[in-house]
């Protein structure tokens, strides 16, 4: 009697209430997962292609192929002292990371093979990269153009007739996407700022390719 007096032994009704509470807590979580209402924000992403072998062809790592092909090559660093692995399109190929980034900074280093080349930067890609936005880095440093596309439909949204003097050197390009505003920078200088008020795409993956160039140091950083 004394032992039972000091030990809190749960009654049957209390056990049932605990089970009911567990069910009540689990059902909404399962529902959120099934309906897609609950979504985990993707973490930051970085790839300098050093973990792959020279000659590897996409898909590799987290990269998927949208069209054409991509391969890993080794080229001399800018100081010509070491070999550096980079990603190169095959037949103007495009590869992409299939994640739902909403607000983010997307940074990539690009080096044209020839001054006439026009590589591209893709972002907020959806539907297996069949829709989204891209920046066209025009050849001969003529400028930059922001496009929105859906399948074969392509719409020019904004452009800059000024451009950084990249030539055939590695240059750092950056896209900042927050809500429906898009900012494009080259070498830290802003060249395009555009607000898409016509059914904007507010989340999606990122991609590279669409023109002859070396790509390196691809980075995506979510922003608040």
UniProtKB/Swiss-Prot annotation:
Species assigned in the record: Methanocaldococcus jannaschii (strain ATCC 43067 / DSM 2661 / JAL-1 / JCM 10045 / NBRC 100440)
Transmembrane segments: 21-41
Transmembrane as UniProt keyword: yes
Entry's localization field: Membrane
Gene Ontology cellular-component terms listed: membrane
One example GO MF annotation: hydrolase activity
Transport found in the keyword field: no
Pfam families in alphabetical order: 3keto-disac_hyd (PF06439)
Keywords: Membrane, Transmembrane, Transmembrane helix
Highest classification ranks of the organism: Archaea, Methanobacteriati, Methanobacteriota, Methanomada group, Methanococci
Name of the protein in its database record: Uncharacterized protein MJ0945
Coiled-coil region(s): none
């Amino acid at each position: 009697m004394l032992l039972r007096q000091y030990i809190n032994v749960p009654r049957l009704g209390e056990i049932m209430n605990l089970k009911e509470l567990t069910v009540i807590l689990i059902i909404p979580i399962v529902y959120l997962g099934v309906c897609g209402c609950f979504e985990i924000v993707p973490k930051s992403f970085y790839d300098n292609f050093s973990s792959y072998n020279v000659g590897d062809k996409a898909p590799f790592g987290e990269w998927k192929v949208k069209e054409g092909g991509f391969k890993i090559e080794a080229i001399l660093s800018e100081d010509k002292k070491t070999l550096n692995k980079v990603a190169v399109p095959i037949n103007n190929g495009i590869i992409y990371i299939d994640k739902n980034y909403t607000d983010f900074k997307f940074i990539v280093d690009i080096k044209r093979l020839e001054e006439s080349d026009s590589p591209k930067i893709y972002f907020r890609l959806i539907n297996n990269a069949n829709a989204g936005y891209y920046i066209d880095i025009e050849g001969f440093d003529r400028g930059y153009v922001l496009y929105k596309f859906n399948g074969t439909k392509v719409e020019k949204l904004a452009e800059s007739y000024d451009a950084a003097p990249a030539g055939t050197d590695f240059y750092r390009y950056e896209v900042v996407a927050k809500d429906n505003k898009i900012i494009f920078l080259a070498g830290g200088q802003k060249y395009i700022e555009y607000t898409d008020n016509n059914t904007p795409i507010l989340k999606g993956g990122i991609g590279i390719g669409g023109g002859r160039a070396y790509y390196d140091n691809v980075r995506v950083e979510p922003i608040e």
